[in-house]
Amino acid sequence: MVEDILAPGLRVVFCGINPGLSSAGTGFPFAHPANRFWKVIYQAGFTDRQLKPQEAQHLLDYRCGVTKLVDRPTVQANEISNQELHAGGRKLIEKIEDYQPQALAILGKQAYEQGFSQRGAQWGKQTLSIGSTQIWVLPNPSGLSRVSLEKLVEAYRELDQALVVRGR
């Protein structure tokens, strides 16, 4: 089981779709060697060094957290049903209401659209929010994603810089 890493006062909570089998096997988020999450958040400025999956708890030192929409591990995210994503969205809203980070970053348009019953999502900041928490949709860093590392870093950096502008 991959546990959430959450605390009050976070700048951002990154929300993946669900754990892959590598993460489920190790208990660490974004654990597959092809997953670019740790490299991207470092290059985008969220951390001052590239953390390893087994150092995930250190995200809290940078006022970052991680969670997921669905607990069930799969090989690919497309194995998750729309019903599971929608139910996960309801649970996620409760978590975010409890912790109220400055931003919630949903990693993937489909995850956001299905989890929050939205259509036509664009990358970046959304008009929908949860209390004072901004919702952002960022490209998924999975190794299966066709988005280039450069584009991932650019999208994540936009969020990091927006939080700096907000004074967080």
Curated annotation (Swiss-Prot):
Recorded catalytic activity of this chain's protein: Specifically hydrolyzes mismatched double-stranded DNA and polynucleotides, releasing free uracil
A biological-process GO annotation: base-excision repair, AP site formation
Short name of any one Pfam family annotated for the protein: UDG
CDD domains: UDG-F2_TDG_MUG
Compartments, record wording: Cytoplasm
Enzyme class: hydrolase
GO molecular function: DNA binding; pyrimidine-specific mismatch base pair DNA N-glycosylase activity; uracil DNA N-glycosylase activity
Segments crossing the lipid bilayer: none
Coiled coil region boundaries: none
Main location: cytoplasm
GO cellular component: cytoplasm
Gene3D superfamilies: Uracil-DNA glycosylase-like domain (3.40.470.10)
EC number(s) per entry: 3.2.2.28
Keywords for this protein: Cytoplasm, DNA damage, DNA excision, DNA repair, DNA-binding, Hydrolase
Function: Excises ethenocytosine and uracil, which can arise by alkylation or deamination of cytosine, respectively, from the corresponding mispairs with guanine in ds-DNA. It is capable of hydrolyzing the carbon-nitrogen bond between the sugar-phosphate backbone of the DNA and the mispaired base. The complementary strand guanine functions in substrate recognition. Required for DNA damage lesion repair in stationary-phase cells.
Oligomer and partners: Binds DNA as a monomer.
Protein family: Belongs to the uracil-DNA glycosylase (UDG) superfamily. TDG/mug family.
Protein name: G/U mismatch-specific DNA glycosylase
UniProt source species: Shigella dysenteriae serotype 1 (strain Sd197)
